[in-house]
């Protein structure tokens, strides 16, 4: 059950609803992120519906019984699709948002060069990994806080807000001091303590689909974040593991419209990790835009041959010029506008 509060509901109204539910033996979880606060209920829902006059409480707009196991992220209670804003940059149904940058932050020079390439390629958000969960314990694990500081310096230079991954619940507070958006990667999609921690952090969250996860499992993971009060969640389809060996992963392009039908959350696509090869990134980007994705997230590197992480899939300048052309020309055909990048800082060389 979900209680939708009126847009002008006061803090006192919300707290009163929570108290009523608690006194009845249930749990109430307040989420903010849309036009009105939403309160998700758990417990004896049938008894609550029969004995509690929830619709009569001050500030309550409506009460919705949901059949989906994911209550707060479901389209059952929020019919219109959500828009998530990352430092003012929108991700939602009317725009195409390009997120680009290096898979891993290596040096200040490499990160700044990649950010300038990303901006020239139509990106409005900068991705970059400071903490890297790798399949091999011997692979480059990221620069940690040093990498976060590099990203912050590059943001100041280029004006691009930061999207970066957090891999441990203990690091959420640290990463949140630098990041504009927190990313939960495929390997951590069901790391429930991490999901709860990012849900309480007060930052927008990008949730990548687990490499072997069903769409329902993906949405249930998003529910963990929403239940902690954060509905500013963007879902990212990044390819799933199948028997196919010709590509790094298999892009489940059908997951985009399915997830958009089931959930009000924005859905973007990662063509870089799906294909794992530079020559596949642009074709998969076209497919993502055509199917109605709300954005794409792309790996960029000024010198892919020396990259410490995922060089074979990173785009270079010529690819980015083509990507900018693709995004500019395809966006209007699917009823969208390309999200512009924020203005760079005064005096910067971006």
Feature map (PLM): residue ranges:
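Active-site mouth loops of central-metabolism enzymes
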Residues: 8, 41, 96-113, 136-142, ...
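Catalytic alpha/beta core domains of metabolic enzymes, predominantly
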Residues: 86, 199-300
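Hydrophobic faces of well-ordered beta-strands that scaffold small-molecule active sites
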Residues: 96-102, 124-128, 162-165, 180-184, ...
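Glycine-rich, proline-tolerant flexible connector loops at the mouths of alpha/beta enzymes
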Residues: 127-145, 302-312
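Active-site-adjacent beta->alpha loops and helix N-cap segments on the catalytic face
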Residues: 75-80, 136-150, 169-171, 186-202, ...
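Alpha-helix-loop-beta-strand connector modules within alpha/beta enzyme cores
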Residues: 140-164, 197-204, 253-267, 313-336
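Catalytic beta/alpha-barrel core
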Residues: 6, 143, 159-168, 180-193, ...
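Non-catalytic terminal accessory/regulatory regions of metabolic enzymes
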Residues: 1-98, 344-350
């Amino acid at each position: 059950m979900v209680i939708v509060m009126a847009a002008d509901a006061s803090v006192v109204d919300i707290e009163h609803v929570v108290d009523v539910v608690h006194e009845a033996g249930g749990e109430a979880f307040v989420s903010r992120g849309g036009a009105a606060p939403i309160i998700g209920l758990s417990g004896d829902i049938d008894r609550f519906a029969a004995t509690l006059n929830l619709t009569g409480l001050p500030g309550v707009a409506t009460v919705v019984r949901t059949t989906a196991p994911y209550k707060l992220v479901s389209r059952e209670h929020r019919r219109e699709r959500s828009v998530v804003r990352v430092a003012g940059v929108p991700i939602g149904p009317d725009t195409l948002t390009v997120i680009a940058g290096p898979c891993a932050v290596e040096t200040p020079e490499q990160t700044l060069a990649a950010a300038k390439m990303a901006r020239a390629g139509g990106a409005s958000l900068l991705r970059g990994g400071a903490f890297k969960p790798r399949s091999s314990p011997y692979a480059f694990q990221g620069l940690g806080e040093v990498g976060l500081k590099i990203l912050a310096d590059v943001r100041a230079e280029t004006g691009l807000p930061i999207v970066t991954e957090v891999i441990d619940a203990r690091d959420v507070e640290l990463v949140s001091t630098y990041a504009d958006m927190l990313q939960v990667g495929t390997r951590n999609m069901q790391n429930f303590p991490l999901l709860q921690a990012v849900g309480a952090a007060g930052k927008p969250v990008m949730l990548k689909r687990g490499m072997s996860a069903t769409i329902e499992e993906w949405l249930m993971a998003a529910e963990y974040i929403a239940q902690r009060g954060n509905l500013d969640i963007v879902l990212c389809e990044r390819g799933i593991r199948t028997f196919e060996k010709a590509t790094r992963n298999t892009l489940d392009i059908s997951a985009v419209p399915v997830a958009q039908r089931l959930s009000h959350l924005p859905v973007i696509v990662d063509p870089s990790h799906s294909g794992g090869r530079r020559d596949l990134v642009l074709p998969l980007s076209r497919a993502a835009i055509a199917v109605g994705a709300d954005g794409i997230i792309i790996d960029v590197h000024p010198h892919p041959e020396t990259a410490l992480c995922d060089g074979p899939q990173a785009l270079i300048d010529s690819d980015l010029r083509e990507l900018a052309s693709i995004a500019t020309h395809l966006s209007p055909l699917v009823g969208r506008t390309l999200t512009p990048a924020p203005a760079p800082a005064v005096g910067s060389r971006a």
